[in-house]
């Protein structure tokens, strides 16, 4: 096998080097790739297949490769230059937006080429040209410059043919692709058979690393930041040599005759000789079943009728099969990620009838359309992905390609996906309407208010504020409550009533006291008049009737005095029983009654003394003095026995004993260390006791009764207690000395 001439190769390399220097001077040079063998995969995305009329599937794998017995297909790989790596093999599907220069360079040279190319070399050339023309980042000016230089290079290289191209009898020329380029602007859209030739499987092994290049192609901004002139020149030089070989093979296809049905069945009989057995992947059947579709079915029909070539399906199927075998693995990685596009192409697995190429007038059309294509704005990786088709068989390979898909998905994420992956703390606001970074930036430039601006005060109003707002709203609407609000005046009324009743009760008590005082004065005056009448000698029955008719007269001591005198005038009477009855009725003052009873019981006393006593009973002072004199004159055996006590006890003034509530409380002296003689003495303290309590104290429990001894007078004290010495203790609450000397300390 003889390769292309050294002169053409050197000229192509020189032109390519000049182009790279020009791009470097303009600052538009592509960044170098650390893995140049992935460049072809990075440049060549897969276009979506065209819509077509579904037809019966045909197995054309038996008659697509003619004259396979003479020379094997793998011979051309033995003479491949060493600088061309395995990953530079063309892709299975051309890109959505190919470059104008490279596309025109490929097709413009077809007019001078001979149809003697090897059938397996034609799809390689076309697909690689599509792969090189995939780069969307080149500006239109650079692409036009490339187009001119590449057209010149094809002019010199078109005459050189590879000896290997004579092995097959007939192949379809490369000019069959312009019809497809008119619709999708793609240099390649050929159908492929349902079952590819097993001899062609050995070519796709080196494409395993090409997925990394496609991943890097999806992030063009990251690639552009790492530019190097030296590595790019070496990479492009290798690609240039490969393009030159593919162009020569493509031109040589025209001169070959069409194979017959008998010849097309030969390629299955002989396996490839030079391809290693380990280079064929295990999943080749699933991936090779994917077929690129033609875009325009009308062009297919017109070209078939125009040129009248019935065996077009057999001629076209072989290049499509070889091309698809080479690029099945990288294309499956792209199509697995974009399985959503399968709905657009439901008939993708059915065979298409290719268009018979026409070498003459279509070349200029391709050049013009390729220039128009190159002037379109550059697309991002997302736009390429949106047009890449996928089939169910491609999705079936997802489990076999997990390693490549994981790497591709990680690097294929754009800035928007990273933003969505790591949302801010307020991501719950954007769940219903997620925004990308671009839309957020655009909204901020337009002045759209953010969530924090629209709600600067996130605090809710308090209950009082809400109640006021509700009241204002109800007033504005004219609404009222169905029932009046609760009033608290009832409680205030109760308090006022309690206060008024308290003061009223006090007033009532005062009035009652005044009325009682007036009544007591009237009763007292009436009883005094009765006593006067008794002394005058009025009939006792009439006086008794008058005294009994007075209400509440039993509470006065004068009533009992009148009664006692009336009984005494009649004869003897029970003075003690009368006294007890007076005490039970609460007669006051009791001392006045005692004095009268004592006078009435004295047999030695004359009637005059009695009358004088009764006449002087009006004044308490005179009667008390007389009683004291009488008591002192009367002999008392107890006084003689207790002379020291009587001598020590002073005479109590009568004025201090007028208050009958004052009594003497006898209590033992607390124990004092070092003074044993004091323990025999007792303390006498004047206290005030109520007559009402004394009357009811017998009904009280033991705890409420008087614990100490309480006597009404000194005589009772001598009778109750036999202590020889008493000590008087002054009561601060009751400043009464009772005639005792108070030692000032």
From Swiss-Prot:
Residue stretches of biased makeup (Polar residues): 67-89, 101-136, 205-216, 224-233, 242-253, 284-301, 427-442, 608-624
Principal subcellular localization: cytoplasm
Source species, domain of life: Eukaryota
Keywords: Cytoplasm, Cytoskeleton, Isopeptide bond, Phosphoprotein, Ubl conjugation
Protein encoded by which gene: Ckap2l
PTM note: Ubiquitinated by the anaphase promoting complex/cyclosome (APC/C).
Modification Phosphoserine, positions: 745
Cross-link for Glycyl lysine isopeptide (Lys-Gly) (interchain with G-Cter in SUMO2), residue positions: 195
Chain positions covered by the region annotation Disordered: 26-305, 319-362, 422-483, 608-638
Chain ranges for the short sequence motif KEN box as given in the UniProt record: 183-185
Full protein name: Cytoskeleton-associated protein 2-like
Signal peptide positions on this chain: none
Tissues in which the UniProt entry reports expression: Highly expressed in regions of active neurogenesis and neural stem/progenitor cells (NSPCs), both embryonic and adult, not detected in lung, liver, kidney, heart, and skeletal muscle.
Feature: compositional bias, Basic and acidic residues: 192-202, 459-475
Biological role: Microtubule-associated protein required for mitotic spindle formation and cell-cycle progression in neural progenitor cells.
Cross-referenced InterPro entries: CKAP2-like, CKAP2_C
Species this protein is from: Mus musculus
Keyword Isomerase: no
């Amino acid at each position: 096998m003889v390769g292309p001439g050294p002169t053409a190769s050197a000229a192509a390399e020189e032109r390519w080097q000049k182009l790279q220097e020009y791009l470097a001077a303009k600052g538009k040079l592509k960044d170098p790739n650390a893995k140049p063998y992935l460049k072809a995969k990075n440049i060549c995305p897969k276009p979506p297949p065209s819509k077509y009329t579904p037809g019966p599937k045909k197995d054309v794998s038996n008659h697509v490769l003619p004259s396979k017995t003479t020379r094997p297909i793998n011979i051309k790989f033995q003479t491949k230059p060493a600088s061309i790596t395995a990953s530079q093999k063309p892709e299975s599907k051309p890109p959505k937006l190919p470059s104008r220069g490279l596309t025109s360079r490929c097709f413009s040279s077809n007019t001078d080429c001979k149809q003697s190319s090897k059938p397996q070399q034609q799809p390689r050339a076309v697909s690689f040209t599509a792969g090189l023309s995939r780069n969307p980042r080149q500006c239109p000016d650079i692409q036009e410059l490339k187009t001119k230089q590449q057209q010149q290079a094809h002019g010199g290289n078109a005459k050189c043919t590879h000896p290997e191209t004579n092995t097959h009898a007939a192949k379809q020329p490369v000019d069959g692709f312009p019809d497809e380029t008119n619709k999708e602007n793609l240099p390649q859209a050929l159908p492929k058979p349902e079952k590819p030739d097993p001899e062609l499987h050995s070519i796709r092994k080196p494409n395993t690393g090409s997925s990394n290049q496609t991943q890097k192609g999806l992030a063009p901004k990251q690639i552009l930041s790492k530019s190097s002139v030296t590595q790019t020149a070496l990479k492009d030089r290798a690609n240039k040599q490969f393009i030159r070989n593919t162009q020569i093979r493509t031109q040589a296809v025209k001169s070959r005759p069409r194979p017959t049905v008998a010849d097309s069945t030969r390629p299955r009989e002989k396996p490839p000789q030079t391809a290693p057995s380990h280079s064929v992947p295990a999943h080749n059947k699933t991936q090779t079943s994917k077929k690129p579709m033609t875009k325009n079915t009308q062009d297919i029909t017109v070209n078939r009728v125009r040129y009248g070539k019935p065996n077009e399906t057999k001629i076209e199927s072989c290049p499509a099969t070889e091309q698809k075998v080479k690029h099945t693995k990288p294309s499956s990685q792209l199509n697995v990620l974009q399985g959503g596009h399968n709905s657009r192409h439901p008939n993708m697995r059915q065979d298409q009838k290719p268009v018979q190429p026409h070498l003459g007038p279509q070349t200029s059309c391709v050049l013009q359309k390729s220039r128009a294509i190159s002037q379109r704005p550059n697309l991002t990786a997302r736009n390429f992905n949106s047009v890449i088709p996928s089939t169910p068989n491609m999705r079936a390979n997802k489990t076999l390609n997990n390693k490549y898909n994981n790497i591709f998905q990680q690097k294929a994420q754009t800035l928007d996906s990273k933003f969505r992956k790591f949302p801010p703390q307020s991501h719950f606001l954007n769940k219903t309407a997620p925004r990308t970074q671009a839309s957020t930036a655009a909204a901020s430039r337009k002045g759209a208010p953010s969530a924090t601006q629209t709600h600067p005060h996130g605090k809710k109003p308090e209950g009082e504020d809400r109640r006021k707002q509700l009241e204002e709203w109800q007033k504005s609407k004219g609404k009222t409550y169905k029932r009046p609000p609760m009033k608290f005046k009832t409680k205030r009324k109760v308090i006022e009533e309690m206060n008024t009743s308290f003061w009223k009760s006090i007033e009532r008590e005062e009035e009652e006291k005044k009325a009682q005082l007036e009544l007591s004065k009237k009763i007292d005056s009436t009883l005094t008049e009765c006593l006067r009448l008794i002394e005058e000698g009025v009939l006792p029955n009439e006086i008794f009737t008058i005294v009994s008719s007075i209400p509440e007269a039993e509470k006065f001591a004068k009533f009992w005095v009148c009664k006692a005198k009336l009984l005494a005038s009649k004869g003897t009477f029970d003075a003690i029983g009368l006294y007890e009855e007076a005490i039970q009725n609460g007669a006051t003052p009791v001392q006045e009654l005692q004095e009268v009873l004592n006078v009435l019981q004295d047999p030695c006393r004359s009637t005059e003394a009695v009358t004088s006593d009764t006449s002087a009973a009006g004044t308490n002072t005179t009667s008390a003095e007389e009683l004291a004199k009488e008591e002192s004159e009367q002999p008392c055996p107890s006084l003689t026995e207790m002379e020291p006590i009587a001598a020590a006890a002073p005479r109590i003034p009568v004025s201090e004993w007028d208050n009958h509530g004052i009594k003497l409380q006898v209590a033992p002296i607390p124990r004092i260390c070092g003074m044993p003689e004091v323990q025999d003495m007792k303390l006498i303290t004047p206290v005030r006791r109520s007559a009402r309590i004394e009357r009811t104290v017998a009904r009280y429990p033991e705890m409420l009764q008087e614990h100490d001894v309480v006597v009404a007078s000194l005589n009772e004290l001598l009778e109750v207690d036999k202590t020889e010495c008493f000590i008087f203790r002054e009561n601060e609450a009751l400043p009464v000395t009772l005639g005792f000397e108070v030692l000032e300390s």
